[in-house]
């Protein structure tokens, strides 16, 4: 019996409906990521790709479990990739061990490796993340518009570097945040001896880059949540305010809100 092949182009390929852990050396560090091939994968048909980033200290296995994407149609149609943060942290946080775009380049390398083995729809590459992973998703949202069609940030840890040196291109953007979040408060603050941004500042960056007219439609959602859809944007911007604490929300159901938003978006 041979050991499982964990290289970036595994042989045999990952079977539809299953997930495997793969590894690559990236810029001198050994990096790891999970790849799940959709239940209905066909080499004839291009598949969207969804990257999912967990919080500080999260293993990709743990995030893949609580993200609950198995409750959505993503499990049927999307190649889902859960990368592991280096020492379980993502760039732009004060505790991160990666800097200067290192994690952005890592994600693009993963995409290239997966694209070499599977039929990827490069027009439908998405990112979602929780907490530190949400902050990193926002980094991708304003630095990797050439790669991603849409991003979704949940309870994001928006440390100041998240909105630094952003590219000006628009991006389909969903932000979900708890108005009672005590860890990453809605109004911003300090943590780990570093400042983090109010949600309105991060939102404002996306409203500016999407040339929105700053007005919005508001509608009530389950669990006392409020959805704000902004008007006049080049690409869609939506904010979901949830009256709970720092979490991956159950009401409204985060995986379905996220996938319903992301899956309809294209890069061009």
Where are these regions (language model features)?
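A domain-start/cap signature at the N-terminus of enzymes
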Residues: 1-49, 128-152, 158, 201, ...
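Acidic catalytic loop of the alpha/beta-hydrolase fold
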Residues: 181-184, 246-248
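Short, conserved loop/helix-junction motifs that constitute active-site signature segments
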Residues: 72-74, 166-169
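The conserved beta1-alpha1 loop
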Residues: 51-55, 155, 177-178
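Short, flexible/disordered intra-domain loops and linkers
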Residues: 186-197
């Amino acid at each position: 019996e041979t050991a499982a092949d964990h290289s970036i182009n595994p042989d045999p390929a990952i079977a539809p409906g299953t997930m495997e852990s793969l590894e690559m050396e990236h810029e001198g560090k050994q990096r790891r990521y999970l790849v799940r091939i959709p239940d209905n994968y066909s080499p004839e048909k291009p598949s969207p790709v969804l990257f999912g980033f967990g919080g500080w200290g999260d293993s990709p296995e743990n995030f893949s479990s609580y993200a609950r994407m198995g409750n959505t149609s993503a499990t049927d149609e999307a190649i889902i990739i859960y990368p592991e943060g280096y020492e379980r942290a993502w760039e732009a946080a004060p505790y991160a061990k990666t800097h200067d775009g290192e994690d952005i380049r890592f994600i693009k390398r993963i995409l290239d490796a997966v694209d070499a083995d599977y039929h990827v729809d490069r027009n439908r590459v998405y990112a979602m993340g929780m907490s530190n992973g949400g902050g990193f998703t926002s980094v991708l949202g304003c630095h990797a518009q050439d790669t991603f069609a849409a991003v979704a940030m949940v309870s994001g840890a928006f440390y100041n570097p998240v909105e630094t040196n952003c590219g000006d291109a628009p991006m389909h953007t969903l932000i979900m945040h708890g108005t009672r979040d005590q860890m990453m408060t809605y109004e911003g603050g300090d943590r780990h001896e570093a400042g983090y941004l109010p949600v309105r500042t991060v939102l404002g960056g996306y409203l500016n880059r999407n040339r929105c007219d700053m007005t919005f439609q508001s509608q009530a959602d389950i669990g006392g949540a409020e959805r704000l859809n902004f008007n006049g944007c080049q690409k869609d911007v939506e904010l979901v305010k949830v009256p709970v604490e720092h979490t991956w929300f159950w009401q409204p159901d985060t995986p379905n809100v996220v996938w319903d938003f992301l899956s309809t978006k294209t890069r061009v």
